[in-house]
């Protein structure tokens, strides 16, 4: 059972899956036609009538929630307009000021939602993907956009590590999805798919020594 489907980003892939056929395939095609004519925050729930109340009014559903969603772009280089968009997302989400040189001489990869309200930034300086930023602006939270961004990133990278301030409210989510984490001063270092101890030690050392790129007023 798939708990969430993002039509904009998942539809083409799902339609090519061998296990999706007959009635379910037709149902997904019909849902896409419906959602294409509705606002991007619209959704359709596939569930049994018995579980409909829980599906509609709680976060823990029993069926599949199909959302119109937003397309997620992946970029190695950004133009000026895209840099402005990413800066706005980061500064709005983190409530701080992005370092002026953040986009200079970068070895980064950028995921940006088509609605310009969420972004993930991957650094390749370490060899293994380092998630330098994961940001969703406040008015987009609760729509499943962050989850769609996260799943897109993980579909591209089976090994990834990142750091988060120890007081970050998203750390409970990180603890649920990571394979392990380690606290270091004001940071928590998380990782997925990294089992070699020598490689992991190098990743933790890299993460703890990265300079801050979001600055806050005193």
Question: What residue ranges belong to the model's regions?
Answer:
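C-terminal catalytic "cap/lid" subdomain
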Residues: 1-160, 168-172, 179, 188-218
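Conserved acetyl-CoA-binding loop of GNAT-fold acetyltransferases
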Residues: 177-183
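Short beta-strand/turn micro-motifs composed of small residues
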Residues: 164
